[in-house]
Curated annotation (Swiss-Prot):
Family listed: Belongs to the MreC family.
Lineage start: Bacteria, Pseudomonadati, Pseudomonadota, Gammaproteobacteria, Pasteurellales
Name of the protein described by the UniProt record: Cell shape-determining protein MreC
One of the protein's GO biological processes: regulation of cell shape
A Pfam entry, by short name: MreC
UniProt source species: Haemophilus influenzae (strain ATCC 51907 / DSM 11121 / KW20 / Rd)
TM annotation in the entry: none
InterPro entries in alphabetical order: Cell/Rod_1, Cell/Rod_MreC_2, MreC, MreC_beta-barrel_core
Length: 351
């Protein structure tokens, strides 16, 4: 069967035809504006194809950028979280240091006498069971600590040193069952002996006749009897008084002012002259005035309004319960009753 179309022209002829056609179009484009309009229309028509052909690349680039941004944001978020944790830890440490600094400042201001040498000690260990109430501090013989030395904190009397090592010392707390301390009621100077019960929040007053004027809320301070311990440092507050007509002695319980179960820093006291018997005594009126100033100072530290009338022991207890940081209350040393002369022990019982 004979083909419809004849044989195609040779390649050379087709090339010449294309060349002449191109030259003709170039000449026509420069002289005829209709060719320009036709070319513009064609470019407009195929412009959408350019966008369509480029869309996969745009989509892939967008996905890649989103993945990079997400990964970058996750890394930045992790870094920021870590920085936030570090800043929070620094803030907590700063708050702790502020509280600690406040406690140390109150501790250093607690002695009643300006002629007393004082030194801060840190509590290393504590034994506060019913049979033993003792702590170990980081001050020893090389630091000048000695057996019988008074130990206080910013709120009240802690106890006394009973043994001294080269670098550490053991302190007997005033709530230990083997410990007793001579005290007096700040309100009326009634003198009694306060003994430990084995509980960190309780003292017992020994041999108190039921006729003695002592009431719940009375503030007990060191009496200084025996010439060994200085007077005027707060020790405890009377919590309960039970009188029975069938018993000659009243049952009196008191609560130590110092928080013995939460001790961290304590203060060791030295008189300017180690011969305490030669230290000038403070009169009861001076003791009351000094302690009154301490109570008012404590109220001011806790941002409480100071009353126009003198603060009472009840006011002190209320402020103590509301204050977060321990108030600026002076404290002094403790003494076992058996350390005193027999005559003075009998004198206390009679009082």
């Amino acid at each position: 069967m004979k083909p419809i179309f004849g044989k195609a022209p040779p390649l050379g002829i087709r090339l010449l035809i294309a060349i002449f056609a191109s030259i003709a179009l170039i000449l026509a484009d420069g002289r005829n504006s209709s060719i320009t309009k036709a070319r513009s229309a064609m470019e407009t028509a195929i412009g959408g194809l350019y966008y369509l052909a480029n869309s996969p690349r745009s989509i892939l680039d967008g996905i890649s950028e989103n993945l990079v941004d997400t990964n970058k944001l996750q890394i930045e978020n992790k870094v920021l979280r870590q920085q936030l944790l570090e800043k929070n830890a620094d803030l907590l440490l700063l708050d702790q240091l502020k509280v600690e600094n406040q406690r140390l400042r109150l501790l250093l201001n607690s002695p009643l006498r300006t002629d007393e040498y004082k030194k801060i000690a840190e509590v290393l260990t504590a034994e506060t069971d019913i049979y033993r109430q003792q702590i170990v501090i980081n001050q020893g013989k090389k630091d000048g600590a000695y057996v019988g030395q008074p130990v206080i904190d910013e709120k009240g009397v802690i106890g006394q040193i009973i043994s001294v090592g080269e670098n550490t010392s053991r302190v007997l707390l005033l709530t230990d069952v083997t410990h007793s301390i001579p005290v007096q009621v700040l309100r009326n100077d009634v003198r009694v002996i306060a003994s430990g019960t084995g509980h960190t929040d309780e003292l017992s007053l020994d041999n108190v006749p039921r006729s003695v004027d002592i009431e719940k809320g009375d503030l007990l301070v060191t009496s200084g009897l025996g010439g060994r311990f200085l007077e005027g440092y707060p020790v405890a507050v009377v919590q309960s008084v039970s009188r029975d007509s069938s018993n000659y002695f009243a049952i009196v319980k008191a609560k130590p002012l110092a928080l013995l179960e939460r001790l961290r820093y304590v203060l060791l006291l030295w008189p300017s002259n180690l011969d305490i018997s030669k230290v000038k005594s403070i009169s009861p009126e001076e003791v009351r005035n000094l302690v009154q100033k301490r109570l008012e100072s404590q109220a001011n530290e806790a941002n409480y309004r100071v009353k126009k009338t003198p603060l009472t022991e009840k006011d002190f207890l209320e402020n103590e319960e509301k204050t977060i940081i321990e108030p600026d209350i002076p404290t002094d040393f403790l003494q076992n009753e058996e350390d005193l002369p027999i005559e003075q022990q009998e004198e206390r019982i009679e009082d």
